[in-house]
Amino acid sequence: MAVYKVRLICEEQGLDTTIECPDDEYILDAAEEQGIDLPYSCRAGACSTCAGKVVEGTVDQSDQSFLDDAQLAAGYVLTCVAYPSSDCTVKTHQEESLY
């Protein structure tokens, strides 16, 4: 099992912190365990409340069912069903920018 460094950033929320996240744990769950409050609703990859945008690195979000191909290509990620697959940087609180 690999453990990756996931940097979570959101200027509007004053958030810029790096967490450690195993490659078999969702980013949202790891953030919560480390005391970081991120938005979420369904926790199943079926809505957009937890949306973020990967600006560096890669994630595996094969469990998601909400984002379309264009949103995926643009780097959007649902943190509730995303595993890190490298060290990465994720802009959080991106639900509004999806639309």
Swiss-Prot record:
SUPFAM superfamilies: 2Fe-2S ferredoxin-like (SSF54292). GO terms for cellular component: cyanelle. Its cofactor is [2Fe-2S] cluster. GO terms for molecular function: 2 iron, 2 sulfur cluster binding; electron transfer activity; metal ion binding. Binds 1 [2Fe-2S] cluster. Its main location: plastid. It is found in: Plastid, Cyanelle. One of its GO terms (biological process) is electron transport chain. [2Fe-2S] cluster binds at residues 42, 47, 50, 80. Keywords: 2Fe-2S, Cyanelle, Electron transport, Iron, Iron-sulfur, Metal-binding, Plastid, Transport. Belongs to the 2Fe2S plant-type ferredoxin family. Ferredoxins are iron-sulfur proteins that transfer electrons in a wide variety of metabolic reactions. Forms a complex with heterodimeric ferredoxin-thioredoxin reductase (FTR) and thioredoxin. This is Ferredoxin-1. It comes from Cyanophora paradoxa.
